[in-house]
Regions:
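Short, well-structured N-terminal submotif of metal-dependent ribonuclease cores
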Residues: 1-34, 47-60
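Histidine- and aromatic-rich ligand-binding microenvironments
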Residues: 2-5, 34-35, 97-98, 136-141
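A generic structural signal for short hydrophobic patches within well-formed alpha-helices
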Residues: 9-10, 39, 122
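A general structural signal for well-ordered alpha-helical segments in protein cores
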Residues: 19, 39, 55, 77-81
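Short active-site oxyanion
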Residues: 29-32, 66-68, 113
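Short, hinge-like loop/turn segments at secondary-structure boundaries
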Residues: 49-53, 86-89, 132-136
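Active-site neighborhoods of divalent-metal-dependent phosphate/nucleic-acid chemistry enzymes
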Residues: 69-114
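Acidic, PIN/NYN-like endoribonuclease modules and their adjacent C-terminal/linker elements
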Residues: 105-141
């Protein structure tokens, strides 16, 4: 089981170079959790770049049986705020997590699961990355 960030589903939706490896990692995980806040963020990004028809295709992807949408509860709320203080935009930390990032981070943190993402922002935090052992991730920085 893994948590999927907005950046990963957007990369899949837009057929970016990471698409095939991200799809493979999701399939290998059997279950891919995604914060409902991250889903809204993904819809916003896709709509902004490609319009509503692309959002319909994104929603079709997220309806596949391996995806489970998880609304934030109190634990995720607290973890998202803690992540904002430690890693959020304006905190001075190089990760500079945005609002949507905080909820993917929080879901992964609360569930103790690795996060599938694109980019370098999360790799500058303490969250485990899908396919990378946490110790290796930290030492490669």
């Amino acid at each position: 089981m893994i948590v999927v960030d907005t950046s990963a589903v957007v990369a899949i939706a837009f057929a970016e170079p990471e698409r095939e490896s991200f799809v493979r990692m999701i399939e290998e995980a059997d279950k891919a959790l995604m914060s409902t806040v991250s889903v809204v963020e993904a819809r916003m990004v896709v709509h902004g770049r490609r319009g509503q028809r692309a959002v319909v295709l994104l929603d079709d992807l997220l309806r596949l049986p391996m995806f489970e949408m998880v609304p934030p509860g109190v634990a995720e709320m607290d973890a998202a705020y803690a992540a904002f203080v430690a890693y959020g935009k304006g905190s001075g930390h190089p990760a500079g997590l945005n609002f949507g990032d905080l909820f993917g981070y929080a879901l992964a943190k609360v569930r103790g699961l690795p996060l599938l993402f694109k980019g370098d922002d999360f790799s500058q935090t303490d969250i485990a990355r899908v396919g990378v052992h946490h110790e290796n991730q930290r030492s490669s920085r």
